[in-house]
Amino acid sequence: SDIRPGKFDFYKFMVHMLEATGTMMLAGVCHYDLHPGNILMDQNNVARIIDFGMAFDGHAIDKDTLDTHWKQLSFGDSTKNAHWISNQEPPEVTIMNAINHGYSAQDAIQQIIYGKDIFKQIAKPVLGIPLSSSMKKLEDFWKTSKSAKDKNWVSFWKSYWTAFDSWSIG
């Protein structure tokens, strides 16, 4: 795959990334920190995932896993670090993190819908999905997920960890 502008095969790159994270998931590994800075191209222009410092074993999630993986909450923060933290994780995880930091689920959902690039720059303008629709779907998810309602974060992670890296790639 040639990474020069106009030559890059985005489809092939995405297939490769999804296969890579699918393989990791089958092995029980969640990277949990996927962003452009952690994807490098090797000498053959093959994408390689690096920096597994935040990775965890999805088959062994417990309270210690969560205690070592709480991320800095970045609502209202415009630093580059906060941008990646805010955008690379699934919105459901950001809601959980916000509740852990004292926000209500409703406030967190509103911050996410109006703050995450996927909603502002892709869902609404490209896909035509109104922000109100995205907000309602997140609210509905949060109201119907047993582990979310119970604030049982270990159960929440055990249920949803397999989607964490997929969200980051998407």
Task: List where the protein language model places each region.
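Conserved structural core of kinase catalytic domains
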Residues: 1-12
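Short C-lobe core helix of eukaryotic-like protein kinase catalytic domains
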Residues: 15-26
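Catalytic-loop of the protein kinase fold
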Residues: 25-42
